[in-house]
A protein has these predicted regions:
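Glycosyltransferase-associated regions of secretory-pathway enzymes
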Residues: 8-10, 20, 117-119
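Extended, non-globular alpha-helical segments
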Residues: 1-11
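Activation targets extended, charge/polar-rich intrinsically disordered C-terminal tails
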Residues: 87-147
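Glycine-rich catalytic cores of cysteine/serine-nucleophile enzymes that process amide/ester linkages
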Residues: 12-70
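Aromatic/basic micro-patches that form nucleic-acid/chromatin recognition or nuclease catalytic surfaces
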Residues: 61-103
Length: 147
């Protein structure tokens, strides 16, 4: 039997090559794309999910790979997002990374189109930062500085 994911770590970032695309100019800096990380405690396995123009990308990650991603994303934003099981009758929405992540975590708002709008809506609804501990950011892991 499989494991039904109860929470995702949703990240928002801007890759170095995003500046090459003129159509991304209107998106807020640091919020050009979003994806998700999930952990299966039964298999002790991390899963990375991302929707791109090439299709859906899914990777299973080892501990070093997940450490590298979490350290890289430290300079951007990552939220803990419990999955909602709200049923929606009519969900016509464009298919991009934002709408895909919203469906993944069961978050439905018709007016959200950009990664930054999604981030702001999640924060407003009480979702918390993965990196925050008692209102402060954790120290970056000094043993793996990939910037």
């Amino acid at each position: 039997m499989g494991y039904l994911q109860k929470e995702w770590l949703v990240y928002f970032y801007e890759a170095p090559y995003h500046s090459e695309y003129d159509w991304m100019y209107f998106l807020k800096k640091g919020f050009k794309h979003c994806g998700a990380l999930g952990y299966d405690p039964h298999q002790k396995l991390w899963t990375h999910l991302e929707f791109t123009h090439e299709g859906t990308a899914m990777e299973h990650l080892n501990q070093k790979e997940i450490d590298d991603i979490i350290n890289y994303m430290y300079d951007f934003k990552m939220l803990r997002c419990p999955v909602r099981r709200d049923w929606q009758l009519f969900r016509i929405k464009d298919m991009n990374c934002v709408s895909w992540i919203m469906r993944l975590i069961g978050y439905h708002r018709w007016y959200i189109f950009t990664p930054y709008q999604l981030y702001c809506a999640l924060i407003k609804d009480g979702y918390s930062s993965f990196y925050n501990t008692n209102g402060q950011k954790k120290e970056k892991n000094s043993r793996t500085d990939n910037r």
